[in-house]
């Protein structure tokens, strides 16, 4: 898989040094495995993955952070969308598609 916006991801986690090693592990998982489906990612990532309105949300470092990406398994591309703390993540109404799209861009 190829990650689009890796530079933006690294910028987003800069204020959170405690998350950096977890992000590096996540990146190695997607880089080293040419996965084509979400089940592979779930199996390799302790099943701490959710899908909401086309976004894939990974729990990072337990439940302290959320890494939000869009995955196109056909083209094998992952697009970084947002990196949120648990507090930021909890403020979003995940049942409201319009709010999710607005908050995540």
Where is each model-derived feature located?
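Basic, Lys/Arg-enriched alpha-helical interface segments
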Residues: 1-64, 73-77, 86-105
């Amino acid at each position: 898989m190829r990650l689009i916006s890796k530079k933006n991801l690294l910028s987003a986690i800069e204020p959170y040094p405690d998350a950096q090693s977890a992000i590096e592990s996540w990146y190695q998982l997607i880089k080293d495995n040419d996965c084509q489906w979400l089940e592979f990612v779930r199996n390799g990532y302790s099943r701490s993955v959710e899908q909401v309105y086309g976004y894939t949300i990974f729990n990072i470092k337990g439940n302290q952070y959320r890494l939000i990406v869009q995955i196109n398994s056909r083209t094998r591309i992952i697009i970084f969308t947002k990196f949120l703390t648990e507090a930021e993540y909890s403020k979003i109404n995940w049942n409201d598609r319009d709010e999710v799209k607005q908050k995540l861009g």
